[in-house]
Each structure stands twice: as C-alpha cells, then as structure tokens.
UniProtKB/Swiss-Prot annotation:
<dbReference type="InterPro" id="IPR050280">
    <property type="entry name" value="OMP_Chaperone_SurA"/>
</dbReference>
<dbReference type="InterPro" id="IPR023034">
    <property type="entry name" value="PPIase_SurA"/>
</dbReference>
<keyword id="KW-0143">Chaperone</keyword>
<keyword id="KW-0413">Isomerase</keyword>
<keyword id="KW-0574">Periplasm</keyword>
<dbReference type="InterPro" id="IPR046357">
    <property type="entry name" value="PPIase_dom_sf"/>
</dbReference>
<dbReference type="InterPro" id="IPR027304">
    <property type="entry name" value="Trigger_fact/SurA_dom_sf"/>
</dbReference>
<dbReference type="Pfam" id="PF09312">
    <property type="entry name" value="SurA_N"/>
</dbReference>
<feature type="signal peptide">
    <location>
        <begin position="1"/>
        <end position="25"/>
    </location>
</feature>
<dbReference type="GO" id="GO:0051082">
    <property type="term" value="F:unfolded protein binding"/>
</dbReference>
<dbReference type="Pfam" id="PF13616">
    <property type="entry name" value="Rotamase_3"/>
</dbReference>
<dbReference type="GO" id="GO:0050821">
    <property type="term" value="P:protein stabilization"/>
</dbReference>
<keyword id="KW-0732">Signal</keyword>
<keyword id="KW-0697">Rotamase</keyword>
<protein>
    <recommendedName>
        <fullName>Chaperone SurA</fullName>
        <ecNumber>5.2.1.8</ecNumber>
    </recommendedName>
</protein>
<feature type="region of interest" description="Disordered">
    <location>
        <begin position="329"/>
        <end position="348"/>
    </location>
</feature>
<feature type="domain" description="PpiC 1">
    <location>
        <begin position="174"/>
        <end position="276"/>
    </location>
</feature>
C-alpha cells in the first residue's frame, strides 16, 4: 500500500516546516498569526499547525502514544524555534543555498517519491501545502545540514589513539546496542530547586514505565526534553565507542528491555533503555580488493596538437613498443603526463576505478605484461601496460575508517546538542500561543514546563 505523500515527507517537514513569513502571510486569508518571535524572525501559526499535523500523521493509529495537544504543540514549537535559530546563525556566518542547488534537491526528493517535480507540486497542493512554502522548508533543511557540517569541520577531530582504543574495546565486547532515552533537561547552572524539580519529574516518569502504565516510547514522546522525543527517544544502533563513557559500563551490564536510571548527565537527568543488542561481527566478511600495477603513456589534445595528430602519435609509440622498445624508456621520452613520466609512466598500485571507468576497463581487460590498444579519455590518448595484480585485504582499513566515523558522529552529537542549548539560551524567544503566550525568555524552558510528577493519562496500554 502506498503511503500518503504527507507521511513520506513528514520527517523533513516536522523538522523544517518553516516558510517565508511574507509569502505565507500573503497567501493566507485572514492574515496569519505569529506563534513565536525568535530574535528577529517569527514562527507563524500556520507553520506550527502544519508541523503538528505532520507529527500526528506519523502516529496514525497510535494516537494514544502522543501527549495532549497542548504538550505536543509546545514540543513542536520548540523544535521550530531551534530551526529558526540555526538558520539565522548559518546565514549570519555566510552559509547560503543557491536556487540551482535547491532545484536539484527538490528534483531528488521528487525522484525518491517516484514522481516528477510537477507531480510533487500537485501532491503538495493536495496535502494543503504551497510549493513556495515547501521550497523554503527544503532550503532551511539544507542550511541546517551545512551548519552542522561546518561545526563538525571546525570543532570535531578524532585521533589515531582514540581509534586504537575503540578497536581494542570492540574486540573485547563485539556488541552493538539499540538504545532509547528520555531526557529531563536542566539549564546550565541549575539551582537546587530546579534540580529537585527535575529529579521529581524523572522519578515520576520512571515509575509510570516500571508499573507498565506507559511504555518507554510513549513516555519519551510525552515527557522527554530531548530533540528526538517525538521519535520515542530512539537513538538507533550504537557501538560502545559511540556511547558516552559514563554510560558505557552500565549498558554493558544491562539486558534487552531493561530501563536504567535516572542518570545525571551534563544535560540533565536521563532514563536509558536497552531495546536490543547484536554481535557487531556477526556476518562480517573479510573484504579483499583487487589492485593493479600499471604504466601508461599519455598524448594530450590541445591547441598545439589536434585529435588526429595525437592519435597518430600514440599509434606510433605503441608500434615501437610492440616492436621491442622498452615501455618505461618510451614513457620517459614521450609521455605528456608530467606526474608519471619521470617514473617511466609508473602509476603504482591502484584499484580499477582509481582513474575513471574507461581507464579501469582497459587495465582489467589486460593480462600482466600486455600493452593495450590506444584508447581515449578526457585527458587525451593513452596506452597502458599492466605490470601485475594483487589481492589486498582492506577489512582492517575499512574498520578503522568506520570506527573513526562513529566516534566523530558521537562527538558531533554531544557537542552540537550543547551548541544548540547555548544558542537557545542566548536567544530572545517570545511565545504568542497556548499557555505560554507572551512568555518572553532568553533561555529554554525549565523542566517544570511539563508536569513535575507525571500521572498516567486514562486508558493507556500496558506492556
């Protein structure tokens, strides 16, 4: 069964359901209301309503897992505020998305959903979303992604020592963990009263879960202050090197289905659930790569040498080599590849696709010692001699690269979440909707904004 188009795009639109206030106001009758002021920007009520609808569409048939409408609206509004702040910070640092880049991204979204851009327009219209609003939301998502990339490049590094330690740890445990969490956030420099309120709230949430009155995912949606609350607090699969050291030992001793905590971390109190675990090495296969050693001679085409002249020259050089001339000596004398000419055309060891598919196809088709027929690439006319082949085990190299990536991802997540907290804490935010209307703030809401001691909603399913 085909999913509704709004569901297919929900993950994009929940996070970045932002539009140009002017454009949206011009399209809305009556004039759109302001849901929140965010520094010099605004979140419109139409943006908030649309994002809430998208969350509800993701929970179709599971409505009892969602919090009351006022709590859901507050959670979604906080997420939209964070998007506005990130976009503002990115644009202030010079991050831009051109119309051409935006058009390519939208064409890709259309293709992924099995339609054309025109078809995308029609489906958006059927779901009640203007195309201009959709373009703005996609632009904002790209901007936020680039801000994260810039943040990672400037602040995140992984040393070889960290990779070595993680590899040793993985060899000992060999496990991966599917985790979920609930965060009861605390502001930086929290007072004793704020800490006590947060402790009371997290204890109440844990009690609901332990009694079976609320499952973990529903509790996360309802009570967590984490950015992934609306995904049930799901953290996905993690290896130990992706888990903060303070929690790694605890998780190693847990059983699937078990909930640990409350745990005090830098962001507040956390409940941690081990959903399931698996052997990271199960099904792992040794990866062997075929590499080639080859020499080549290049004759370029340019202002001083026509296509026909270049082809005639390469034909002559090949004839000399086939007639007994030494390939390396001929390359040193006649090749126009300045990088390899001094080495007799030697390219060293390389995988088949290292110099493009046309070059690789020629090398793969030769036997060791054989010389190819002349062939054309963008660089010009070539002949290549295959010297040898070897099988290289790249499993260890790939494993190190994967470990480096996972450590970097974990560091980025931790640091970027702290960065978002700082960004939110420094911002001027004034809510104009719901029970927080006219509440001006320069920091994120304290945990007491949600019930301090949660009580179960009626008719909640038990585990």
């Amino acid at each position: 069964m085909t999913k509704p188009f709004s569901v297919l795009l929900a993950s994009l639109l929940v996070i970045t359901s932002t539009v140009s206030p002017l454009a949206s106001a011009q399209q809305s009758q009556p004039l759109d209301r302001i849901a929140a002021i965010v520094d010099e920007d605004v979140v419109l009520q139409s943006e908030l309503d649309r994002a809430v609808r998208n969350v509800k569409s993701q929970y179709a048939g599971r409505d009892n897992q969602l919090p009351p409408d006022d709590v859901l609206q507050r959670q979604v509004l906080e997420r939209l505020v964070l998007v506005k702040l990130q976009v503002g910070r990115a644009e202030g640092s010079g991050i831009r998305v051109s119309d051409e880049e935006l058009n390519r991204a939208i064409a890709s979204i259309a293709q992924q959903n099995g339609t054309s851009v025109d078809g995308l327009r029609q489906k958006l219209a059927a779901d009640g979303m203007g195309y201009a609003d959709f373009r703005a939301s996609v632009r904002d998502e790209i901007i936020v992604q680039r801000l994260r990339q810039s943040f990672a490049q400037s602040r995140i590094s992984v040393s070889e020592g960290e990779v070595d330690t993680a590899l040793a740890q993985q060899a000992t445990t060999g496990s991966q963990y599917h985790l979920a969490h609930i965060l009861v956030g605390l502001p930086e420099g929290a007072t004793a009263e704020q800490i006590a309120t947060g402790q009371k709230k997290v204890d109440g949430v844990k009690a609901l879960i332990d009694k079976g009155e609320l499952d973990f995912s529903a509790a996360a949606v309802r009570y967590s202050d984490s950015p992934n609350a609306l995904e049930g607090g799901d953290l996905g699969w993690r290896s130990l090197d992706e888990i903060p050291n303070a929690f790694a030992q605890l998780i190693r001793d847990m059983q699937p289905g078990q909930v640990a905590g409350p745990l005090r971390g830098p962001s507040g109190f956390q409940l941690l659930k081990l959903v399931e675990m698996r052997d990271a090495n199960a099904g792992g296969e040794k990866k062997v790569l075929t590499e080639y050693n080859a020499r080549h001679i290049l004759v370029r085409i340019g202002d001083n040498q026509t296509e026909a002249q270049a082809k005639a020259k390469i034909d002559t050089l090949r004839a000399r080599i086939v007639g007994g001339a030494d390939f390396q000596a001929t390359a040193k004398e006649s090749s126009e590849d300045t990088n390899s000419r001094g080495q007799g055309g030697d390219l060293g060891w390389f995988p088949a696709d290292a110099f493009g598919p046309d070059f690789g196809k020629q090398v793969e088709g030769l036997t060791d010692g054989a010389v190819s027929e002349p062939f054309r690439t963008q660089a010009g006319w070539h002949i290549v001699q295959r010297v040898g082949t070897r099988q290289t085990d790249v499993s260890a190299e790939n494993q190190r690269a994967q470990i480096r990536e996972t450590i970097g991802r974990r560091k980025l997540e931790e640091e970027y979440n702290r960065y978002l907290q700082e960004l939110r804490g420094e911002a001027f935010v004034s809510f104009r909707t719901g029970d927080r209307a006219d509440a001006d703030a320069t920091a994120a809401p304290e945990p007491a904004a949600a019930p301090a001691a949660p009580t179960p909603p009626p008719a909640q399913p038990t585990r």
